[in-house]
Amino acid sequence: IRILYDDVVCWSLKKRFFKEMQDAGIAVRPFLEITFPQLASRINYRNHRKITVIDGKIGYIGGMNIADRYVEGTKWGTWRDTHLRIEGPAVRGLQLLFAVDWSYECKEVLSDSRFFPPVADKGKSGIQIAPGGPIGEWSNIAMLFLKAITNAKKNVYIQTPYFLPTESLVKALQTAALAKVDVRLMIPERSDSTVLRFASFSYITEMLRAGVKVYFYQPGILHSKTIIIDDELCSVG
């Protein structure tokens, strides 16, 4: 068992929390270890991935962290998120992402058949693992969303905890709505970040003006990052 965690997000956890796992034989490592987060020059270079791979054959990916709030909820209600279980060749993509991050942090290469066993096709749906990060000039995920929204014919449904779109994404959503595509946006009425909550609200008027339908999730905190286009393309992160 190997666990790679983000050191800034987990900075407040006691060292004994990780020591108990290490004593049980679990390899636990921080990603870009930080001694003082307030003074760190690399605080923005974090690992925000939520990946679980089992035996190289089963993968879980989405927005869920490992935290008590997913079981106990919050003072505002439930903590709503979306996570997927995948099987088949796409699991190799998840395993590769973890292996690259692990190699970067631990200088250990995970490449043999234990980690990448033969995997048969499963089902008929195509899955693409699209990693994002600060490497490279172009944001492949942002470009994928822009192209998909621009090409939408029937509907665009978006769930996000923080709606902070680029100007190009704003124009793409407005253009789609004005072209009579059913564009719907769901954001949380309450947020775990007051600053980001009000920043998200600042875009609502211009969305409504173009015909985008905006919904507020009220049962609790919405943390899901999901987009569905024409009932054919779905992205979860």
How would you describe each model-predicted region?
Residues 1-237:
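Charged, low-complexity intrinsically disordered terminal segments
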